[in-house]
Design a protein with these regions (language model features):
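Acidic-leg catalytic submotif of subtilisin-like serine proteases
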Residues: 1
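Histidine/acidic-residue-rich, glycine-tolerant segments that coordinate divalent metal ions
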Residues: 4-16, 22-23, 35, 41-164
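Ordered, soluble secondary-structure elements with a strong preference for glycine-centered loop motifs
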Residues: 17-18, 118, 180-185
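DPxDG-like acidic metal-binding loop motif
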Residues: 25-32
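Residue-level signal for short amphipathic helical patches enriched in basic/charged
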Residues: 26, 54, 178
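Residues at alpha-helix caps and immediate loop-helix transition turns in enzyme cores, especially N-
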Residues: 27, 58-59, 120, 186, ...
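Metal-dependent amide/peptide-bond hydrolase catalytic core
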Residues: 126-227
């Protein structure tokens, strides 16, 4: 259960306020209240509370369900919190403002067995660890230091036990890029590394690379209005 001392602490076991989405909802509600009380503007404002901001693809679902047919919207202004910035400060610019997000998942199938007999096994923990270290060289050795790209391995799960060498494992991770060229290069290198490790260790390696969101690009006119 959440151990925060704030007034809005979660009362549900296993659920806490740990990401910015709760803040986004509160911020938009505050903006709606402010503008509703002070209607000193022309036109109409529609406040869009996007569900499932990230992997739920909430924006896409809202569009498919007829958001723009129900409301006449000519421009959209979105915002995202930025912890560490001074209170009241807004940061924006024309062009690319947020990175894309791609997810990768790699499945390794070797041969499990007793921990006392590694020579007759295909230990996917050792092989997967080798692959993870290779993945870390993509950003540091294949892309420009100024690219702003990030590759993070975030999960490494196997079917092994304390005295049993794993026969299968899954590696998952997240990739952020500022342009499609870097994203394509990273995807291609992950593919080559998976093929190489499979050949070297004579195991089966399958992988997927899915781009959830492309880069956020700010248009000139709306950005000028904000500034």
């Amino acid at each position: 259960k959440e151990k925060s001392i704030h007034d809005y602490v979660s009362n549900s076991v296993g659920i806490m306020h740990a990401c910015g989405h709760d803040g986004h909802m509160a911020m938009l509600m505050g903006a709606a209240q402010k503008l509703s009380l002070d209607r000193n503007f022309d036109g109409r404002i529609v406040f869009i509370f996007q569900p499932n901001e990230e992997h739920g693809l909430g924006a896409q679902a809202m569009i498919e369900e007829g958001l723009f047919e129900k409301f006449s919207i000519s421009e959209i202004y979105a915002f995202h919190n930025l912890p560490g910035s001074p209170l009241g400060e807004v940061s924006t610019r024309v062009g690319q403002i947020c990175s894309s997000e791609s997810l990768f998942e790699i499945e390794l199938n070797g041969i499990g067995g007793h921990s006392s007999m590694p020579h007759v096994c295909k230990d996917v923990i050792a092989i997967g660890s080798e692959l993870i270290m290779s993945l870390q060289t993509i950003i540091s050795r294949k892309l420009s230091p100024g690219s702003g790209a990030v590759l993070s391995v975030t999960e490494f799960i196997s079917d092994g036990q304390r005295n049993i060498l794993a026969g299968s494992a899954v590696i998952k991770g997240d990739v952020r890029t500022k342009n499609s060229a870097d994203r394509d290069l990273i995807e291609n290198l992950i593919d080559k590394m998976c093929q190489g490790i499979a050949t070297e260790h004579e195991i089966e390696v399958n992988h997927i690379f899915n781009t959830e969101f492309i880069e956020t690009i700010n248009a000139q006119v709306p950005t000028d209005i904000v500034i």
